[in-house]
Amino acid sequence: MKHLAIGALAARHALHARGEALARAAFYIAILLVLSRLWHALGAGSSYVWYVALTEWVTLAMPLISVEIEEDIRRGDIAYRIARPVSYLWTKVAEGFGSGLVRLMIIGGAGGVAAWILTGGPPPRGVLLSLPLATLAFFLLVLWQTAIGLSAFWIGDTQPFFWIWQKLLFMLGGLLFPLEIYPEWLQRVAYCTPFAPLLHGWARLAFDPDPALAAKTLLLLLGWGVALTAFLVWLYRRALAVMDVNGG
Protein backbone atom coordinates (compact mmCIF):
# COMPACT_ATOMS: atom_id res chain seq x y z
CA MET A 1 0.00 0.00 0.00
CA LYS A 2 2.86 2.37 0.77
CA HIS A 3 4.25 2.03 -2.72
CA LEU A 4 0.81 2.61 -4.24
CA ALA A 5 0.65 5.87 -2.28
CA ILE A 6 4.16 6.77 -3.46
CA GLY A 7 3.17 6.11 -7.06
CA ALA A 8 0.01 8.20 -6.69
CA LEU A 9 2.02 11.06 -5.20
CA ALA A 10 4.51 10.90 -8.08
CA ALA A 11 1.60 10.98 -10.53
CA ARG A 12 0.19 14.12 -8.89
CA HIS A 13 3.59 15.82 -9.03
CA ALA A 14 3.94 14.91 -12.70
CA LEU A 15 0.46 16.26 -13.39
CA HIS A 16 1.29 19.60 -11.78
CA ALA A 17 4.66 19.79 -13.56
CA ARG A 18 3.32 18.72 -16.95
CA GLY A 19 5.52 21.01 -19.02
CA GLU A 20 7.97 18.18 -19.72
CA ALA A 21 5.16 15.87 -20.84
CA LEU A 22 3.76 18.55 -23.13
CA ALA A 23 7.21 19.07 -24.66
CA ARG A 24 7.50 15.33 -25.25
CA ALA A 25 4.02 15.36 -26.78
CA ALA A 26 5.03 18.09 -29.23
CA PHE A 27 8.13 16.10 -30.20
CA TYR A 28 5.96 13.00 -30.54
CA ILE A 29 3.61 14.74 -32.97
CA ALA A 30 6.57 15.92 -35.05
CA ILE A 31 7.89 12.35 -35.23
CA LEU A 32 4.48 11.05 -36.29
CA LEU A 33 4.26 13.65 -39.04
CA VAL A 34 7.62 12.60 -40.50
CA LEU A 35 7.08 8.85 -40.13
CA SER A 36 3.53 8.96 -41.49
CA ARG A 37 4.84 10.59 -44.65
CA LEU A 38 7.49 7.88 -44.88
CA TRP A 39 4.94 5.08 -44.56
CA HIS A 40 2.62 6.71 -47.08
CA ALA A 41 5.54 7.07 -49.51
CA LEU A 42 6.23 3.34 -49.10
CA GLY A 43 2.61 2.59 -49.89
CA ALA A 44 1.82 1.17 -46.46
CA GLY A 45 -1.64 1.38 -44.95
CA SER A 46 -2.73 3.61 -42.10
CA SER A 47 -2.39 0.72 -39.64
CA TYR A 48 1.40 1.03 -39.93
CA VAL A 49 1.16 4.67 -38.90
CA TRP A 50 -0.76 3.56 -35.83
CA TYR A 51 1.93 0.94 -35.17
CA VAL A 52 4.63 3.63 -35.02
CA ALA A 53 2.31 5.85 -32.99
CA LEU A 54 2.05 3.09 -30.38
CA THR A 55 5.74 2.23 -30.14
CA GLU A 56 6.85 5.87 -30.03
CA TRP A 57 4.14 6.67 -27.46
CA VAL A 58 5.46 4.23 -24.87
CA THR A 59 9.10 4.99 -25.61
CA LEU A 60 8.73 8.75 -25.24
CA ALA A 61 6.82 8.39 -21.97
CA MET A 62 9.63 6.43 -20.32
CA PRO A 63 10.95 7.99 -17.09
CA LEU A 64 14.72 8.35 -16.77
CA ILE A 65 14.97 6.47 -13.49
CA SER A 66 18.53 5.43 -14.27
CA VAL A 67 19.63 9.07 -14.20
CA GLU A 68 17.85 9.68 -10.89
CA ILE A 69 19.50 6.67 -9.22
CA GLU A 70 22.89 7.65 -10.62
CA GLU A 71 22.49 11.15 -9.16
CA ASP A 72 21.46 9.75 -5.76
CA ILE A 73 24.65 7.68 -5.71
CA ARG A 74 26.88 10.48 -6.95
CA ARG A 75 25.58 12.98 -4.37
CA GLY A 76 25.73 10.46 -1.55
CA ASP A 77 21.98 10.69 -0.91
CA ILE A 78 21.62 6.96 -1.44
CA ALA A 79 22.77 6.12 2.11
CA TYR A 80 19.93 7.83 3.94
CA ARG A 81 17.38 6.93 1.27
CA ILE A 82 18.14 3.24 1.68
CA ALA A 83 17.93 3.61 5.48
CA ARG A 84 14.27 4.59 5.23
CA PRO A 85 11.68 1.96 6.26
CA VAL A 86 10.32 1.82 2.69
CA SER A 87 12.36 -0.09 0.08
CA TYR A 88 14.42 2.29 -2.05
CA LEU A 89 14.20 -0.11 -4.99
CA TRP A 90 10.41 -0.30 -5.12
CA THR A 91 10.07 3.37 -4.24
CA LYS A 92 11.94 4.25 -7.44
CA VAL A 93 9.82 1.79 -9.41
CA ALA A 94 6.59 3.24 -7.97
CA GLU A 95 7.71 6.82 -8.62
CA GLY A 96 8.73 6.01 -12.18
CA PHE A 97 5.54 4.14 -12.99
CA GLY A 98 3.30 6.75 -11.35
CA SER A 99 4.85 9.71 -13.15
CA GLY A 100 5.09 7.67 -16.33
CA LEU A 101 1.35 6.97 -16.37
CA VAL A 102 0.69 10.71 -16.43
CA ARG A 103 3.06 11.12 -19.38
CA LEU A 104 1.37 8.19 -21.11
CA MET A 105 -2.01 9.91 -20.83
CA ILE A 106 -0.79 13.33 -21.95
CA ILE A 107 1.41 12.09 -24.78
CA GLY A 108 -1.10 9.43 -25.80
CA GLY A 109 -3.95 11.91 -25.98
CA ALA A 110 -2.00 14.29 -28.18
CA GLY A 111 -0.57 11.52 -30.34
CA GLY A 112 -3.91 9.77 -30.73
CA VAL A 113 -5.51 12.90 -32.14
CA ALA A 114 -2.50 13.50 -34.41
CA ALA A 115 -2.52 9.92 -35.71
CA TRP A 116 -6.26 10.13 -36.36
CA ILE A 117 -5.77 13.29 -38.41
CA LEU A 118 -2.74 11.92 -40.28
CA THR A 119 -4.44 8.65 -41.19
CA GLY A 120 -7.81 10.22 -41.91
CA GLY A 121 -9.73 7.82 -39.72
CA PRO A 122 -10.17 6.31 -36.26
CA PRO A 123 -7.69 3.78 -34.90
CA PRO A 124 -8.04 0.12 -35.93
CA ARG A 125 -9.73 -2.05 -33.31
CA GLY A 126 -6.40 -3.72 -32.62
CA VAL A 127 -5.12 -0.46 -31.15
CA LEU A 128 -7.69 -0.65 -28.35
CA LEU A 129 -6.76 -4.30 -27.80
CA SER A 130 -3.12 -3.31 -27.41
CA LEU A 131 -3.58 -0.68 -24.68
CA PRO A 132 -3.61 -3.02 -21.62
CA LEU A 133 -0.55 -4.81 -22.99
CA ALA A 134 1.13 -1.45 -23.58
CA THR A 135 0.66 -0.56 -19.91
CA LEU A 136 2.22 -3.86 -18.83
CA ALA A 137 5.10 -3.38 -21.27
CA PHE A 138 5.61 0.13 -19.90
CA PHE A 139 5.93 -1.29 -16.38
CA LEU A 140 8.65 -3.63 -17.64
CA LEU A 141 10.44 -0.67 -19.22
CA VAL A 142 10.40 1.00 -15.79
CA LEU A 143 12.01 -2.13 -14.31
CA TRP A 144 14.69 -2.04 -17.02
CA GLN A 145 15.42 1.60 -16.30
CA THR A 146 15.76 0.82 -12.60
CA ALA A 147 18.19 -2.02 -13.29
CA ILE A 148 20.32 0.25 -15.46
CA GLY A 149 20.32 2.83 -12.67
CA LEU A 150 21.54 0.28 -10.13
CA SER A 151 24.56 -0.42 -12.33
CA ALA A 152 25.87 2.98 -11.15
CA PHE A 153 26.96 1.25 -7.94
CA TRP A 154 29.73 -0.37 -9.98
CA ILE A 155 30.38 1.81 -13.03
CA GLY A 156 29.34 5.29 -11.86
CA ASP A 157 28.14 6.51 -15.26
CA THR A 158 25.12 4.59 -16.54
CA GLN A 159 24.99 6.27 -19.96
CA PRO A 160 26.98 3.56 -21.81
CA PHE A 161 24.64 0.82 -20.52
CA PHE A 162 21.58 2.93 -21.28
CA TRP A 163 22.81 3.72 -24.79
CA ILE A 164 23.39 0.03 -25.59
CA TRP A 165 20.05 -1.01 -24.08
CA GLN A 166 18.19 1.75 -25.92
CA LYS A 167 19.67 0.79 -29.29
CA LEU A 168 18.81 -2.88 -28.72
CA LEU A 169 15.26 -1.88 -27.80
CA PHE A 170 14.93 0.26 -30.91
CA MET A 171 16.29 -2.38 -33.27
CA LEU A 172 15.12 -5.69 -31.77
CA GLY A 173 11.93 -4.19 -30.37
CA GLY A 174 10.82 -2.84 -33.75
CA LEU A 175 10.47 0.81 -32.78
CA LEU A 176 10.20 2.28 -36.28
CA PHE A 177 9.51 -0.79 -38.41
CA PRO A 178 7.57 -3.99 -37.66
CA LEU A 179 9.80 -7.02 -37.29
CA GLU A 180 7.96 -8.66 -40.20
CA ILE A 181 9.95 -6.56 -42.68
CA TYR A 182 13.31 -7.57 -41.13
CA PRO A 183 15.44 -10.31 -42.70
CA GLU A 184 14.31 -13.71 -41.45
CA TRP A 185 17.50 -14.35 -39.46
CA LEU A 186 17.15 -11.02 -37.64
CA GLN A 187 13.51 -11.76 -36.87
CA ARG A 188 14.54 -15.01 -35.20
CA VAL A 189 17.15 -13.19 -33.14
CA ALA A 190 14.67 -10.49 -32.09
CA TYR A 191 12.00 -12.99 -31.05
CA CYS A 192 14.51 -14.70 -28.73
CA THR A 193 15.10 -11.48 -26.79
CA PRO A 194 12.93 -9.61 -24.25
CA PHE A 195 12.86 -6.58 -26.54
CA ALA A 196 10.39 -7.90 -29.13
CA PRO A 197 7.39 -8.21 -26.77
CA LEU A 198 8.21 -4.85 -25.16
CA LEU A 199 7.26 -2.96 -28.33
CA HIS A 200 6.50 -5.02 -31.41
CA GLY A 201 4.60 -7.79 -29.63
CA TRP A 202 1.61 -5.65 -28.68
CA ALA A 203 1.98 -2.78 -31.20
CA ARG A 204 1.56 -5.14 -34.17
CA LEU A 205 -2.03 -5.64 -33.05
CA ALA A 206 -2.63 -2.37 -34.91
CA PHE A 207 -2.41 -4.28 -38.20
CA ASP A 208 -3.01 -7.84 -36.92
CA PRO A 209 -5.75 -7.71 -34.24
CA ASP A 210 -5.61 -11.40 -33.38
CA PRO A 211 -6.74 -12.27 -29.80
CA ALA A 212 -4.46 -15.32 -29.83
CA LEU A 213 -1.54 -13.04 -30.66
CA ALA A 214 -2.52 -10.75 -27.80
CA ALA A 215 -2.65 -13.72 -25.41
CA LYS A 216 0.78 -14.91 -26.55
CA THR A 217 2.23 -11.43 -26.04
CA LEU A 218 0.68 -11.27 -22.56
CA LEU A 219 2.35 -14.56 -21.59
CA LEU A 220 5.69 -13.37 -22.96
CA LEU A 221 5.47 -10.09 -21.06
CA LEU A 222 4.54 -11.88 -17.83
CA GLY A 223 7.35 -14.40 -18.26
CA TRP A 224 9.99 -11.78 -18.98
CA GLY A 225 8.53 -9.65 -16.18
CA VAL A 226 9.05 -12.41 -13.61
CA ALA A 227 12.62 -12.97 -14.82
CA LEU A 228 13.39 -9.25 -14.82
CA THR A 229 11.93 -8.78 -11.32
CA ALA A 230 14.06 -11.62 -9.97
CA PHE A 231 17.15 -10.14 -11.62
CA LEU A 232 16.33 -6.69 -10.24
CA VAL A 233 15.98 -7.99 -6.67
CA TRP A 234 19.27 -9.88 -6.99
CA LEU A 235 21.02 -6.81 -8.40
CA TYR A 236 19.68 -4.60 -5.61
CA ARG A 237 20.96 -7.01 -2.96
CA ARG A 238 24.38 -6.99 -4.59
CA ALA A 239 24.30 -3.19 -4.61
CA LEU A 240 23.53 -3.13 -0.88
CA ALA A 241 26.45 -5.49 -0.31
CA VAL A 242 28.72 -3.10 -2.22
CA MET A 243 27.57 -0.26 0.04
CA ASP A 244 28.32 -2.31 3.16
CA VAL A 245 31.80 -3.19 1.92
CA ASN A 246 32.52 0.44 1.08
CA GLY A 247 31.23 1.64 4.41
CA GLY A 248 28.07 3.19 2.90
Question: At which residue positions do the language-model features occur?
Answer:
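Hydrophobic transmembrane alpha-helices and immediately adjacent juxtamembrane helices
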Residues: M1-G248
